[in-house]
């Protein structure tokens, strides 16, 4: 079974499962997905999140995926050894219907922390009505995923507010996302001057601009299939202050096409934003860190070298 089909099965399975919802205190562990022992989910909102959307049931976790997220959290993974001072907020993919929170989340954090980079895994809200990728409905399905973007903005501010406590450099905090999470990377990279919620505490005085951005097989950036015209919701917000960006996609990606990365690449180049694009002939979609004989499986090493060239970690 292909990786994309496998994740689709995970999402459908999770949607069919039911669980008992327990009322807990704000700082208690939420029901649904749980991180590995030794790590704690931190609610990113002190109370109810803004723009709450209805979901069909309680948060449900199955086979490495999670659905019906209404209570967003961040989980911090710190390096055991050498610390570079850099941090990456990770956005798993899942079409804004669910989150591949292990495949494109905890496994990614294991890799990053092994390189001395602090990883902050964001369990952002899904589904994010009206932005739910349930079909290939471009060009109509180009809305900004407001609840998810609110969560991303808030998390970047929280990470900066804890920089001293977590031994981070406030100027080395970036984002990495896959598929829908890759689209969220482009949103937070271009909407950092657009506040989408009312400030709730002192952390919201911090900047939500990423210092660097990494989008792996991002989706819904091109206006149409076989077109490199960029989604105007993103294009209209690109400026010279958009952070340096790393893009990667395969030509045989039949879920989110190569034009998604190409269109964003061209938009960034037009604004003189430093950008690096890696395009491969084969590899499909949703491959994460899975090893293969294909060249694309070496993408983590490319990211590490790129982070060194832009001064985020030691080359």
Question: What does each of the following model-derived ranges do?
Answer:
Residues 29-82:
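N-terminal cap/lid segment of alpha/beta-hydrolase-fold proteins
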Residues 85-93:
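Short beta-strand element of the alpha/beta-hydrolase
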Residues 95-104, 123-147, 191-192, 197, ...:
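Cap/lid segment of the alpha/beta-hydrolase catalytic domain
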Residues 101-120:
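Short amphipathic alpha-helix adjacent to the substrate-entry channel of hydrolases
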Residues 147-234, 240:
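Primarily recognizes the serine-hydrolase "nucleophile elbow" in alpha/beta-hydrolase
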Residues 247-249:
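Short beta-strand/loop motif that positions the catalytic acidic residue
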Residues 254-260:
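Conserved alpha/beta-hydrolase "acid-adjacent" motif
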Residues 262-315:
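C-terminal catalytic histidine-bearing segment of alpha/beta-hydrolase fold enzymes
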